């Protein structure tokens, strides 16, 4: 059955699992308005009903083609429209990418995510990334790609190559989408998400907060994600990383409690999705990250770089996970406790 972009917005009568519902923006905003500790408590309860709260899924993200993107996203240093001193680079060599994936796996990552600064790939680009996907899959890792808007048949080609997840974020509240991006529409994102679902790929879809949006607009973003049908398997929540030269480099800092609220509301509205702490984590104190894990975050990017912005170094993440008695998801599922400690350096205490 073909899934149209309209059908991706969950209707009240469409319930793929018992917890599914249509989320009105006002109802999501009401969740944001709950007393902080009550909200965290509710989110933690829902998290524990669906996941082991001590397991954290580790992904590593690599930019395989950096800079020169024709899109004008106000938050992105890779846009050719912004003067960020980030030059356009050619696509990385396949062997170099595979070597990066090997290193990521050896350090405990279970998923290797690859991003390319395109509006959308050309057919020859799909051939190239398909070869890369096959090579990474050969290492025994999950694969995720973020390559922009897809034409007909491209998602099927990526699926055939072995791609597991396709990342395509909704970025912000649909009602303010054109305030942030002028070179594409919210409907264009929905169209590609429909192609991805029709091809049988898993969906990684989230957004960015801290772009001068209101709480109501944050609620609009979460509602638009929660009403995708089915809900995304993976939901990355990014905290804006301000980069000089981008239109948002002077954005007002988002209060840390508001970010934690966003994580909690994402968990409540998308109970079976992996909620990932994504960009902006390098500026988050350990206590703030701990609150995010308590509120339902159960995935992080592992490695010292996210596309072009910084990320906590692996040693710091190991120390934090040990302090919080958290461990990587991958090896626990295989029952290999010794492998957890060997690959990630994190001591597992059951």
UniProtKB/Swiss-Prot annotation:
Gene Ontology biological process terms, A to Z: biotin biosynthetic process
> What catalytic activity is recorded?
(4R,5S)-dethiobiotin + (sulfur carrier)-SH + 2 reduced [2Fe-2S]-[ferredoxin] + 2 S-adenosyl-L-methionine = (sulfur carrier)-H + biotin + 2 5'-deoxyadenosine + 2 L-methionine + 2 oxidized [2Fe-2S]-[ferredoxin]
KW Iron-sulfur (keyword) present: yes
Q: Which Gene3D superfamilies match?
A: Aldolase class I
Q: Which Pfam families match?
A: BATS, Radical_SAM
EC numbers for this chain = 2.8.1.6
Q: What highest taxon heads this organism's lineage?
A: Bacteria
Q: Which residues bind [4Fe-4S] cluster?
A: 69, 73, 76
**Statement: the UniProt record of this protein carries the keyword RNA-binding:** no
Q: Which GO terms describe its molecular function?
A: 2 iron, 2 sulfur cluster binding; 4 iron, 4 sulfur cluster binding; biotin synthase activity; iron ion binding
Domain Radical SAM core positions: 54-278
- Keywords in UniProt for this one? 2Fe-2S, 4Fe-4S, Biotin biosynthesis, Iron, Iron-sulfur, Metal-binding, S-adenosyl-L-methionine, Transferase
What the entry lists under PANTHER family is as follows:
BIOTIN SYNTHASE, BIOTIN SYNTHASE, MITOCHONDRIAL
Q: How does it assemble?
A: Homodimer.
State the family named in the UniProt similarity comment for this chain.
Answer: Belongs to the radical SAM superfamily. Biotin synthase family.
Q: What does this protein do?
A: Catalyzes the conversion of dethiobiotin (DTB) to biotin by the insertion of a sulfur atom into dethiobiotin via a radical-based mechanism.
Q: What is this protein called?
A: Biotin synthase
């Amino acid at each position: 059955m073909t899934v149209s972009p309209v059908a991706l917005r969950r209707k009240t009568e469409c319930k793929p699992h018992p917890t599914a519902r249509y989320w009105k923006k006002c109802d999501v905003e009401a969740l944001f308005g709950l007393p902080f500790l009550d909200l965290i408590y509710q989110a933690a309860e829902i998290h524990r009903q669906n996941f082991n709260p001590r397991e954290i899924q580790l992904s590593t993200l690599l930019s395989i083609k950096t800079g020169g993107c024709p899109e004008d996203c106000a938050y992105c240093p890779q846009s050719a429209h912004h003067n960020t001193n980030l030059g356009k680079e050619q696509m990385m060599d396949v062997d170099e990418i595979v070597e990066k994936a090997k290193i990521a796996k050896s350090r405990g990552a279970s998923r290797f995510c690859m991003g390319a600064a395109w509006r959308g790939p050309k057919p020859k680009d799909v051939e190239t990334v398909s070869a890369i996907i096959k090579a990474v899959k050969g290492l025994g890792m999950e694969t995720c790609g973020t390559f922009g808007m897809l034409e007909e048949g491209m998602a099927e080609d990526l699926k055939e190559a072995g791609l597991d997840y396709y990342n395509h974020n909704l970025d912000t509240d649909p009602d303010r989408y054109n305030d942030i991006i002028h070179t594409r529409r919210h409907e264009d994102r929905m169209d590609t998400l429909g192609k991805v679902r029709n091809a049988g790929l898993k969906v990684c879809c989230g957004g960015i907060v801290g772009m001068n949006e209101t709480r109501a607009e944050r609620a609009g973003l979460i509602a638009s994600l929660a009403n995708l049908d089915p809900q995304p398997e993976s939901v990355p929540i990014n905290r804006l990383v301000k980069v000089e030269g981008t239109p948002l480099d002077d954005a007002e800092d988002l209060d840390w409690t508001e970010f934690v609220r966003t994580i909690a509301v994402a968990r409540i509205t998308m109970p079976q999705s992996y909620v990932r702490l994504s960009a902006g984590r390098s500026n988050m104190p350990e206590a703030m990250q701990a609150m995010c894990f308590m509120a339902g975050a159960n995935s992080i990017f592992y490695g010292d770089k996210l596309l072009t912005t910084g990320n906590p170094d692996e040693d710091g993440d190991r120390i934090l996970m040990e302090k919080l008695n958290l461990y990587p998801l991958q090896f626990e599922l295989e029952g290999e406790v010794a492998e957890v400690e060997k690959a990630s350096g994190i001591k597992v205490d059951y």
